[in-house]
A protein has these predicted regions:
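A generic structural motif
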Residues: 12-18, 153-154
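N-terminal beta1-alpha1 ligand-phosphate binding loop
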Residues: 1-13
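Hydrophobic alpha-helical membrane-association signature
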Residues: 1-2, 101, 140, 191-194, ...
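Residue-level "edge-of-site" marker
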Residues: 23, 90, 161
Length: 204
């Protein structure tokens, strides 16, 4: 809901938006490509996307549960000026799905750090959206911002939007003392203000 609300505001300001749902894609697990001196990841021999996980799944889809669809994400990033990453909080961390995407972006960062080429992520802005019942969503957002900076994105300090329903780390179920549902928050003055600050931090 937070991502969709942000995209609506961005679109209303005249920007083209595209929503990619990685949960609907078959993204193969990252491989250990750092053998052989650490130059296997992003090798030009690893196909057009320079990713062995993708190339191997194309060569032998049965072994990998089907052909890898990470190129949908790669191409989406390549076409974008700004990328928003959204995740739930899982045990004080981001989701395993987002972690898989982060690991699969090694091939982009390694083109610069290993092969001395231009980083395809350089100059692209990124923002982070984090939602959870509790478990310190703010810390998850900050960690993700640092991760995307290391990958090569430009991440403004205020380009994060966090929803954490309760500050009580021991509260597993909702009760009347919790904050309102996120949907109610997003249409409130406070929620609209939060979206505006997030979007404007990205220059949108």
């Amino acid at each position: 809901m937070m991502l969709e609300a942000s995209l609506r505001v961005i679109a209303s300001r005249g920007h083209e938006v595209t929503l990619l749902d990685a949960a609907k894609l078959h993204v193969v697990q990252n491989l250990s490509c750092y053998a052989g001196g650490g130059r296997n990841c992003a090798s030009p021999d690893a196909g057009p996307y320079r990713c062995w996980a993708h190339k191997n799944s194309v060569d032998d889809p049965a072994k990998y549960g089907g052909e890898d669809e990470m190129p949908v994400i790669y191409d989406g990033i390549a076409d974008a000026d700004v990328v928003l990453w959204a995740t739930s909080v899982r045990w004080m961390s981001h989701s395993s799905l987002l972690q898989r995407l982060i690991e699969r972006m090694n091939t982009l960062e390694n083109r610069a750090s290993v092969y001395g080429e231009a980083n395809p992520l350089a100059g692209k802005l990124a923002g982070v959206i984090v939602a959870g019942q509790h478990y310190e969503g703010q810390k998850v957002a900050i960690c993700l911002q640092e991760t995307f900076i290391r990958l090569g994105f430009t991440v403004p300090l205020d380009a994060q939007m966090v929803w954490q329903r309760t500050l009580d780390l021991n509260l597993e179920q909702g009760d009347g003392s919790n904050r309102p549902h996120v949907g109610l928050h997003l249409v409130s003055p406070a929620g609209r203000g939060q979206i505006t600050r997030f979007v404007e931090a990205l220059g949108l």
